[in-house]
Every structure is written in C-alpha cells, then in structure tokens.
C-alpha cells in the first residue's frame, strides 16, 4: 500500500501538470520557475479528492522527498487556494 506522507509545515507551491496517465497511475508536474520533474502518484491524488489530471492543468503541490526523488505529498486544486 502506498503511504500518504506527512506534509504538515511543507510549503505550498504552484505547479503545472506535465502529463498524467490514469491507467499507469502516475505522472509528473513542474513547479513554477523550475524544470525539475515532480512525481504524481494516483493514491496521493485520490487522497486529496482527484480522479485524474490533465496536461497543462494548474495545481498547488506540497513537495516531499520520495524514494526516487521529489514527489507530490499533497495536491490541491488551483481554484481552492486563496
């Protein structure tokens, strides 16, 4: 089972979805002003109420260090962040 990381105190950063493949259960996003790929896992999306993401979609991420590099520990809708 995929664990949901603790993101308390982790900065929220604006990002854009690079690609997401629902059938594979993962994808990548880029944080604004950075070319580093941020891993997006389907279980994290589901935990935060998403069922899918589209390429180019604006989101807000809380990025943590995952087993293979930077990953989204939390995904928030751009529209719900004030």
Question: Where are the model-predicted features located?
Answer:
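Short boundary/loop segments of OB/S1/cold-shock single-stranded nucleic-acid-binding domains
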Residues: 1-13
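S1/OB-fold single-stranded RNA-binding interface
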Residues: 11-43, 72-74
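Beta-strand secondary-structure signal
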Residues: 14, 60-62
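Short beta-strand micro-motifs enriched in acidic
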Residues: 20, 62-66
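Ubiquitous "structural anchor" signal
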Residues: 33-35, 57, 64, 77
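Histidine- and aromatic-rich ligand-binding microenvironments
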Residues: 34-40, 48-51, 65-67
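Short nucleic-acid-contacting surface segments enriched for D/E, G, S/T with interspersed K/R
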Residues: 47-60
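OB-fold/S1-family single-stranded nucleic acid-binding modules
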Residues: 65-82
